[in-house]
């Protein structure tokens, strides 16, 4: 296994190359994100909020983690927006995350809506997605997006402020795990959902990237804005300290790096991804932090070693019990072929992605 001389990415990362000095293509190309600019963000916020059809300027989805809490603070206290918050209850929220959200919405004096699908249906979705594709995060992502679109539409909200940060831009699998056509194919193959359950979960069962883009243009769907891509981000530790002071946010003190502690299944999914792909989000995020100058490579390696990604997480048995999985099931999961369902993604989405890339050239 080849490891970059500057960060901790390995040759398991798809498309990664190394120069003669052993430096990966991300590091050698100075792959550090530059914000689009706060002035541009403010112009977008001011323009889009005039399209509201109700009392709220923006919807802020909350998970209880750092980024979404920080976005909530910025929206209310910095950009003076009238905000509605929502959470998709995926069945795996940590109690710490739930408590963080409750304190934050009280301090910011905002309304909070929790969208909760049927537990038994969710369990069938997660179990069968994991057994067939080795991943459950994509299904959760589909549920989050569908519900945030619905809440925004129900309340006439013109935009959604999403807490995704540049730190995560290279953190996820290239597999299109949130493709609805792919999701439908896997669920039909599993035979675990009725048509009604499928439609209830998806909410917009025929949605694709082209329909979504057109819908946003004509006001059928809200505009998605990622504020952390426009402004200079606080380092991870400083962001935690800031929202602790302003929102009484509590951190997971059991580990040094606490992104995604809001979901108790995250260590499990990282373990599975590493076994199947040879890398996972922590490796990517720590490498991005190295390139941003937040930590040294040595520090990244120490943090990564402390995560014990290659070992079964402490709550491994709990996750198996929740999803009615056996050790034999997990043996099969870890043998899943990477990107097994890529050929079943939406043709419209494929074409749309190519078109967007061509336009950006």
Where is each model-derived feature located?
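Histidine-anchored nucleotide/phosphate-binding helix
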Residues: 68-80
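Short, glycine-rich nucleotide/cofactor-binding loops
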Residues: 58-67
